[in-house]
Regions:
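Generic N-terminal leader/processing signal
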Residues: 1, 292-293
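Aromatic-lined, polymer-binding surfaces characteristic
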Residues: 26-41, 46-289, 295-296
Length: 300
């Protein structure tokens, strides 16, 4: 997983010039970033090693039909152009949309039923990456069929439960931590990938973009004993790991949005300005035997 994250981080692109329709692939694994990675392989030891492991994993996935490693298959296809990966992604997507639901039995048994959770959010992300990668290898009818299936299984439950009226069952007061950003933002990325075929998907992605700043700005609720999402210094009350996951999901959506809307300005999020200081403060040992301040003093 660390290997795919290494390259995924490099593959985040900010383009220039506005486009009404998405030119696939154009979310995270953009042609520009793919080319940059190709140039670095052979020159950067870590990048070369990461790519080798990713391709090996993708080759193993050719033997199955699981969505779980669709990001590996997608990257392998975009890096190599080998149709065997595209064919496998197409097969996986067509098989995936045959499901009745992606919801878990545990969550669906709740009252009211939770149609979506973190597991479903991750499936939405993987589906978005796969659809974006293989889009140009699909016929018009296949694009439409897969888009409708992914919208039903992923976008509608995620944005329906967590964001959109009149079916929304969660709020920042009830679920203001990183579940909210994961479910909303991964649903948003999937919606972005489907927007050429489905106007409702484009509207859903726009709603995510419009409302996402409210998660950062949530001021808490004294009556329900809910702390605000971030304090003035940039810290998150639910711990470093919760902050990392929640912010990661939000930023991935913003990167995909920016790539899909080159030239557009992103919303101003003041809380982002303090996040690097927060992470550095929490991760930098300053007590006991691991006190880096003492070691720094000796070195200086």
């Amino acid at each position: 997983m660390k290997r795919i994250v290494l390259l995924a981080g490099v593959l985040c692109s900010m383009g220039m010039g506005y486009a009404q329709k998405l030119t696939h692939p154009d979310l995270l694994y953009t042609p520009e970033r793919i080319e940059q990675v190709k140039q670095r392989i052979g020159q950067d030891e870590q990048m070369t090693s990461a790519w080798k492991e990713i391709k090996q994993t993708a080759e193993k996935e050719l033997k199955g039909n699981s969505l779980n490693k669709a990001d590996y298959l997608s990257l392998a296809y975009l890096m190599t152009g080998e149709k065997v990966y595209a064919d496998k992604l197409k097969t996986i997507l067509l098989k995936t949309i045959e499901a009745e639901t992606w919801g878990s039995a545990e969550m669906l048994a709740r009252k009211p039923a939770w149609r979506s959770d973190l597991g479903l959010a991750h499936k939405a992300y993987l589906s978005a990456i796969a659809y974006d990668a293989v889009y140009n290898d699909l016929s018009a009818s296949e694009r439409k069929k897969i888009a409708k299936g992914l919208y039903r299984l992923g976008v509608e439950p995620l944005l329906g439960d967590w964001l959109l009226e009149p079916v929304r069952i969660h709020s920042l007061n009830s679920m203001g931590h990183n579940w909210w950003t994961s479910c909303v933002c991964m649903g948003g990325i999937l919606a972005l990938s489907l927007q050429n075929e489905l106007p409702e998907a484009k509207e859903g992605a726009q709603a995510v973009y419009d409302y996402l700043p409210e998660w950062f700005n949530f001021a808490g609720d004294v009556l329900q004993q809910k702390a605000k999402t971030f304090d003035e210094a940039g810290g998150m009350y639910e711990s470093l790991n919760y902050a990392n996951f929640g912010i990661q999901e939000a930023l991935q959506f913003y990167v995909a949005w920016k790539n899909a809307h080159p030239g557009a300005s992103l919303s101003d999020i003041p809380q982002l300005k303090n996040l690097s200081s927060f992470f550095a403060h929490v991760c930098y040992p300053c007590t006991g035997i691991a006190d880096m301040r003492k070691k720094a003093g000796k070195i200086l």
